[in-house]
Amino acid sequence: MSGIALQGIRCHACRNAAFRSFAAISGLSSSIRRPQSSISYPGSKLYQRNVRTTGRRQFSTLGSVKSQVDSDLPTKTETKEDASAESSHIPWYLQDESHKPSSHPLKQQELPPLPENPPPILENLLQYISVDAGLDDLALLDLRGLDPPPALGANLIMIIGTARSVKHLNVSGDRLCRWLRSNYQLRPIADGLLGRNELKIKLRRRARKAKATGDASSLNSRDDGITTGWICVNVGDVENGPLKTKNSQDRNFIGFGGTEDKVRIVVQMLVEEKRSELQLEALWGSLLNPEAGEMNPAPRDDIWGNLSSETTSSRKGVDSIASTFSQRFPGRRHIHTQARPDTLEPLSHEILGNIVQESRPALPSKIVSTSMASPSVSSLLEQLSQLPEEEARRELGLGPGDRDSTLFLRLFYEAVSKSDTETVLIDKLSFARAAVLLKHPAYSKTDLYRAFKSMAASGCDISEELAMDTVRTLLSFQGPENAANERVPEQDIDLALRVLEHMSLRGIKIFNGEVFFLLHKASAFQSHVLPANDAPGATNTPADPDSISKVPVEELDHITTVHNRLSKLMASANVDFDYKDYPELLKMYFEHGNYSNFWRLWHRIPLMQIPRTKELYLLMFRLHAKLGHQRQAVDCLSSWVPMMAREQPPVALDEELTRDIMACMLVADPAIDQKTDDGTVSQFTRLWKQCLRDLKSFKAANSQ
């Protein structure tokens, strides 16, 4: 086959058929079957009846519509077709296809039946959507009886239709909005709709790019703003039909405003691929008929990902959770008005038990029951917190699946079994937090996040304090204190951000100083670090070189970029840190080489009407002495030692502050002690002599 012929065969099915025909001529057997393009929608038969109209359609579907296979076809015909397709060697262009039945195009144009008490506009709207707009496979969902109402509004009627292409989708949405405005004086809102000129401009730009690259298929993988595939037209509030029930005034009403019987109509217009992906009919159909969903349970995607309690490694669990969120909800927020039920099943324990040594010395348990009755969960956790860390980790057993290896676990799960569902979820979340804070090797932050999402998915009321405790635990360091080059993993930060996002959806204010402080701290190293290319020299000699580790410059630049972005976000949100966090922030900025942010925060403290106390000056002098940078030590001493007397209130010198100033002077001028003895005059000799006199007076005062 020539290259021109291969270029002409763009369709995947045509390429397979051509390959099958040439393979048949050459005597090879091919098992490639022609792909079927019929897609079934589980919720599209909620309202169906016979064809109500066969009017002339402005968007003809006779040439481009995908045929669907009728359910009443005999199985013998399908078996015979498959057998003949596999055994026959007749080329595809010579095969007789007259015996293959095809569904009538009007099957996709059936109008759904009207619900009870339909609004007067509904029948004309369905007629226009099907005949004039040209949407196929219409489905009508009557959501007026849902309690609580959907997020789109109460008394909702939803119409779902399929467009043939993205261009057809935008043209149909635009014409529908114009038709509603001109005929019914409504003001529809179309989310995802591109205007006529905007659509033409984007299509023209895409055509130019495809022509320049010479390959139009390379642009299909990018989101250019045209391939959304979904337009939601909110028709607005319309008059409702006559009610056959008792008068609406007899119904109890709680809230503000009056009781209105208007109906809100929403038209969901999607391309075929987007409709099969979202499955809106199945989602709303399960809410309309929950009994059917219980009788025929099917796997579904949850907003919190997979709720199974399988215990795996921390990295694997985090990756699976992140992939579920990124694929199903890329960069969007979704509002749910009904809680999803969650089954409380014991966590399985298979892999994590190998992390902990199975052979342990049999030590007596320090957890005791203080009364004949079972102790409460709060008292058990309180006793656990009072134990040494090693003994407390021993009381937690082998992992999440262990329930009876220690006395604490037996008492804990016995107390949990007597509580209601909400209390059980809160207790399990507190237990997971305690295990992570104790740095038990078999309990990971992924287990803590699973406990939180189980509580959130069950619809329990999560307090702000409980959610913030979870965020603090997720953003905590797991290694020993001042461990070299330790940072909070990005997976743990991602889990904390998901908890914060859930808090925001629940109306909790997450833009506060504590949240930004935790994010600043989690994105940095736990200990003092220096760039790897910053070798100690005459002007940069750390006081304790072993306590300062070297890291690549790129990592420090990345941390600085993250801190700068967080600072800009705080400025735009008009949020500031809490004063108690200032010393740790100053230390973190300085130890990561972010001196600009250090001095910016240092100068901002008095502007906020907050005095710079002795503790802040002690921190500044100690950081410069530990860094060992001569030039920075000189600038610090010359600028801020005189400034101490000008503070409001003034910072008085004492023995501790004097020693830190002298340590900083030894960095600025290592030979200052010898220069003072020799009588040589230098920049800091006078200050050095004053510090010596002050130390003598302090010692004399202490001796008395």
UniProtKB/Swiss-Prot annotation:
Highest taxon of the lineage: Eukaryota
Keyword terms of this UniProt record: Membrane, Mitochondrion, Mitochondrion inner membrane, Transit peptide
Gene3D superfamilies, alphabetized: Beta Polymerase, domain 2 (3.30.460.10)
Region (Disordered): 57-118
Ranges of biased composition (kind: Polar residues): 57-72
Membrane topology summary: Peripheral membrane protein
GO terms for cellular component: mitochondrial inner membrane
Transit peptide interval: 1-59
Compositional bias annotation for Basic and acidic residues: 73-83
GO biological process, one term: mitochondrial gene expression
Subcellular location: Mitochondrion inner membrane
Sequence similarity: Belongs to the ATP25 family.
Its job: Probable mitochondrial mRNA stabilization factor.
Record's protein name: ATPase synthesis protein 25, mitochondrial
Species in which this protein is naturally found: Arthroderma benhamiae (strain ATCC MYA-4681 / CBS 112371) (Trichophyton mentagrophytes)
